[in-house]
Each structure stands twice: as C-alpha cells, then as structure tokens.
C-alpha cells in the first residue's frame, strides 16, 4: 500500500496493526520527514516502534540494527505488542545481540498475550519443536489456530499441516483441505502448493491431477521452489499435461537454482540422459554434486557411478566409493549393493 502523505501512512500503520512491511511512501524523501515526525514524539510507544522499523530498514535514516533494537525495546517496555514480536525475532537471529532463545520465547509469549498473530505462530513453532520450553504439540496447535483465525498466512498452513499429519490434533483431511483453501485464497504460495498435493492424492477432495497441476503452477509462478519442481515433474511424466521434457527441464532448473534438492537431482538426470536438451555430463556432474552435497542419496549414487565409470570425469574408484558410502548411510539400497560389489572386487 502506497501513500502520498505521512498522515495517511501513520493512520494505516495503526489501523493495520503496525504492519510496516506492507506500507510505503511514494516519495522516498518523505521518509526523512517521517523519521523527524516520529522522533519528535519518541516518548510514545507507537512512534518508538516506528523508529525501530525505520532503523531496521534504513528508511529516512542510516540503517542500524543496534538502534532498531533499542527503539523496539523501548516500545516493548511501554507495552507495544508488535515491538515485542520484533524483539523475539532479533533474539532468534542473534542480530546485534547474542542469540537467546529463552528471551525470544519470553517476548513471543508477551506479544501473543497481546494478540499479535505473528508472535502466536512463532510461539507455536517453539512449542512444536520444544525450543526453550517442553515440547507440547497440542499447545502449539492451539496457538497456530488462534493465529490462523486472525488471518496469519503461515499459521493457516501450519493448521492445515497439523490436520493433514495428525500432529497435535486428530488427522482430518477435510479440515486440512479447508484450511489450505483459505490460505490459497489469500495467495499464499505454500498453501497453493499444498492444495495441489491434496488434489494429486485425493486427500479431503476428489482426486484431480488437472486441479493439482493448476495449483502447483500458481505456486510456482509465485516463486515457490518445491512447486516449480512439482510442475516440472508433471511435464516430465505427462501427468494431466502433454509430456514435454523441455518444459520439465525449464521448471526443474528454476527450482534447482533456488536450492530445491530434488530439482537439482532431476536437472542432473536430464543432462545425463539428454532429456529436453543435449547430453552434457559436465552439467550433470555439477547438479549431482550440488544435490549430493545437500544430502540427496540418489544424486550421490549417480555421482558415484560417474566416477566409477569415468563418465564425464576422470575414473576414480575411491571417490566413487566415498559417494556410495554417503548414500548408504542414508539408507539407499543401490548404494549398499554397489558397496558390496566394491568390496567383493577390491575397488576403491
């Protein structure tokens, strides 16, 4: 939301519960005036929080994590819920202060008590993971649900996931589907992708690969890497769309460049086998290595095989065995079989 005046900006800053990240001034020079306006009212918690954001993003003033923390702390000490949430984030990340998860838990708790949905969601994560507290999945779900009912996108997908997996609440695909729909209607990429998963598997709905592809594509176009990989897979296998290796590779590469581990392996396979492109063993090795280093066992096996046979690399039994061993530790059956052959023949 963009505004032409400071008064409009400040009105929406309060009305939208201090969501500074979605508010903008059309004229960048006006941020200096906004800073001066807020600084002149620095004894008020609302303006203390605003100064925290201005220092955080370096708008109207030189960016300073330390100054941002100081102003958020003043605002939080004066009862500002969103400033408390920001302090929680700072203590989690350990930016300009030493990381302190106990402090983060404390500030998230205080912020949650004041109804800040983002803090509720993050506090739910702490309870789910047992961070700075005893793990309590039921309490985590309750916090997710409160935040979701306030419209928090992350919490909405967390509630849906809890229902989908039966984590902290009885498994219920219908309720999971319901919450994913709400998230998708808000344009949340994770919810869109997850709704695609529900349609692909017929969870809480009639199975529809066409609908699944549609939601995967929407999420992919919003930049979600795992959705890009899913779109690539549908083109790869010809699921509800004509098989098209070029389109599959296009989406796999977009996902791989974002660090999606399965996409990295898939790109490696496409370059190894010349699917949608010409064979390029150098690129195959590059992507298998990226995926292998990220922990994908199948990519480790493919990379090991390249070294074993000298495909695109200098033949090296020792390096091949190292990759097979890494994959075997992750339970890959092919790697275990290959290691058996290695020891039998004395390779490596």
Language-model segments: residues:
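Alpha-solenoid helical-repeat scaffolds
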Residues: 27-59, 70-77, 86
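Short helix-capping/linker turns of helical repeat alpha-solenoids
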Residues: 40-48, 57-59, 64, 77-81, ...
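Hydrophobic face of amphipathic alpha-helices that form TPR/SEL1-like repeat modules
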Residues: 48-57, 84-93, 120-129, 133, ...
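Canonical positions in the second alpha-helix
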Residues: 37, 74-75, 110-111, 146-147, ...
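Residue-level detector of alpha-helical secondary structure
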Residues: 7-10, 35, 145, 196, ...
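N-terminal alpha-helical interaction modules that lie
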Residues: 1-39
